[in-house]
């Protein structure tokens, strides 16, 4: 594949990658020695500017970094009782962030306060949490009990700790499978995509919790570790998996529904198979022509590449 850049995180296995929301050439990578089993962690700032970034740790802590300050980190937050598995800035107000943990909680934080602002109980290992991209009061989470939960901070705390919707990811009658990742559609803020242990990517309309998935995207051979909707197209998303591939998808939302009820099948647009170990992180660049992607894996590699190549004519590799 042409148009691919590579950086090696020698001695450290990447766990997550994130493009800067301000500069198209700046990427942050979170990594751990010995595949995260034991040892130190390291955050690689590949050209990142002096903007703050938050990193989640295996000891349950969160650390805030500012590359303009010599002393690292500038803030420590430690309330989670087990590994913190995800963290997300509020994309609207930019003054809070949210974290999820294996301790079964989601916590909301301010970068200026050492203690969390609120705790949202999930009750099972919570792999991923996120803010709605257009509404700063809406928070989502997916967990090991195979459910997507939506919280609305505008509701009273007494109302189930702000819980407004619980959506089963697994089909009725099927055994639950751990949900590992999810993301809000950037153009339709009622649509959320999920992925997990059963290798299937599903999309849901949060307004209809009992309606089942809108779309099923099947193709991964092992668990889907990370997914992200495109910031450039409403019907395109990308996913990384333990099958060592990154796949590009179309959720078929632009096509009219047929007479049959049920979820639509999505379309796989292409496969990138240059990683030689588990793919643990994917993200889109917000700038440019729309298509540059960062992917990381346990092969100690950060790959930056143009996903438009996967949609071009000829064999998709």
Predicted stretch roles:
Residues 19-24, 87-94, 113, 129-137, ...:
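Loop/turn segments within WD40 beta-propeller blades
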Residues 30-33, 39, 56-59, 99-103, ...:
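Conserved strand-to-loop turn within each blade of WD40 beta-propeller repeats
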Residues 24, 40, 59-61, 94, ...:
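Surface-exposed loop/turn positions within WD40 beta-propeller blades
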Residues 7-13, 50-51, 77-84, 120-126, ...:
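WD40/WD-repeat beta-propeller blade N-cap
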Residues 46-49, 67, 152-159, 205-209, ...:
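Short loop/turn segments immediately following beta-strands, especially the blade-tip
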Residues 2-7, 24-49, 67-70:
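Beta-propeller domains
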Residues 283-317:
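Blade-level signature of beta-propeller repeat domains, shared across WD40, Kelch, NHL, RCC1
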Residues 36-47, 62-66, 106-110, 148-153, ...:
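WD40-repeat beta-propellers
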């Amino acid at each position: 594949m042409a148009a691919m850049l590579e950086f090696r995180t020698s001695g450290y296995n990447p766990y997550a990658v994130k493009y800067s929301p301000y500069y198209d050439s700046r990427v942050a990578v979170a990594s751990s020695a010995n595949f995260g089993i034991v040892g130190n962690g390291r955050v690689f700032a590949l050209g990142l500017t002096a903007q703050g970034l938050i990193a989640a740790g295996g000891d349950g802590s969160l650390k805030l970094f500012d590359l303009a300050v010599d002393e690292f980190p500038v803030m420590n937050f430690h309330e989670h009782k087990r590994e913190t598995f995800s963290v997300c800035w509020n994309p609207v107000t930019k003054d809070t962030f949210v974290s999820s943990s294996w301790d079964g909680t989601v916590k909301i934080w301010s970068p200026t306060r050492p203690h969390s602002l609120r705790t949202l109980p999930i009750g099972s290992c919570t792999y991923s949490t996120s803010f709605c991209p257009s509404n700063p009061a809406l928070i989502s989470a997916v967990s090991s009990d195979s459910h997507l939960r939506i919280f609305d901070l505008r509701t009273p705390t007494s109302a189930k700790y702000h819980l407004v919707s619980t959506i089963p990811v697994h089909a009725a009658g099927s055994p639950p499978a751990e949900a590992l990742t999810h993301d809000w559609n950037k153009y339709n803020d009622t649509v959320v995509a999920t992925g997990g242990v059963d290798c299937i990517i599903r999309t849901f309309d949060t307004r209809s919790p009992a309606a089942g998935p809108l779309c099923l995207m099947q193709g991964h051979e092992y668990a889907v570790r990370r997914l992200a909707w495109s910031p450039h197209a409403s019907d395109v998303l990308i996913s990384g998996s333990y099958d060592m591939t990154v796949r590009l998808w179309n959720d078929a939302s632009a096509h009219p529904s047929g007479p049959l009820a049920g979820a639509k099948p999505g379309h796989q647009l292409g496969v990138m198979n240059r990683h030689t170990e588990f793919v643990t992180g994917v993200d889109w660049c917000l700038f440019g022509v729309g298509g540059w992607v960062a992917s990381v894996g346990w092969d100690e590699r950060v790959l930056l590449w143009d996903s438009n190549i996967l949609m071009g004519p000829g064999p998709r590799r």
